[in-house]
Amino acid sequence: MAEHKSDFSTDLKKGDTVIVVAGKDKGKQGQILQVLGKKSSVLVEKVNMIKRHTKPAQNREGGIVEKEAPIHISNVMIVDPATGKATRIKKKNLEDGRKVRVAAGSGEVLDK
């Protein structure tokens, strides 16, 4: 079986602060917990919460657990650290040869 390759390439990384631009959680901000490459989705902290009913097991109690559900990357944008608004990402080569991600709005470097 051939491996499914995503149609979307993402410049988002774990730990980036993003804002939701579409859907039921539009306007909410949070940090990326996980990037799901094959699904072209991200898990964002405290955004798109769902309830899961779990059975009791040896190491955990049963009950209703709230957890984050994936959001498609087309529905989130990175937050510009300089302005606090949603922005696109550009890539830039620095003098020392490193490739870094740059906020398109302000030109602020996103990589540390």
From Swiss-Prot:
A cellular component term, taken from the record's GO annotations: ribosome
InterPro entries tied to this protein: KOW, Rib_uL2_dom2, Ribosomal_uL24, Ribosomal_uL24_CS, Ribosomal_uL24_KOW, Translation_prot_SH3-like_sf
SMART domains: KOW
NCBIfam families xref list: rplX_bact
Alphabetical GO biological process terms: translation
Species per Swiss-Prot/TrEMBL record: Magnetococcus marinus (strain ATCC BAA-1437 / JCM 17883 / MC-1)
Subunit text: Part of the 50S ribosomal subunit.
Name of the encoding gene: rplX
Source superkingdom: Bacteria
This protein's name: Large ribosomal subunit protein uL24
Top-level taxonomy: Bacteria, Pseudomonadati, Pseudomonadota, Alphaproteobacteria, Magnetococcales
Disulphide bonds in the chain: none
UniProt entry keywords in alphabetical sequence: Ribonucleoprotein, Ribosomal protein, RNA-binding, rRNA-binding
Family: Belongs to the universal ribosomal protein uL24 family.
Function: One of two assembly initiator proteins, it binds directly to the 5'-end of the 23S rRNA, where it nucleates assembly of the 50S subunit. One of the proteins that surrounds the polypeptide exit tunnel on the outside of the subunit.
GO molecular function, one term: rRNA binding
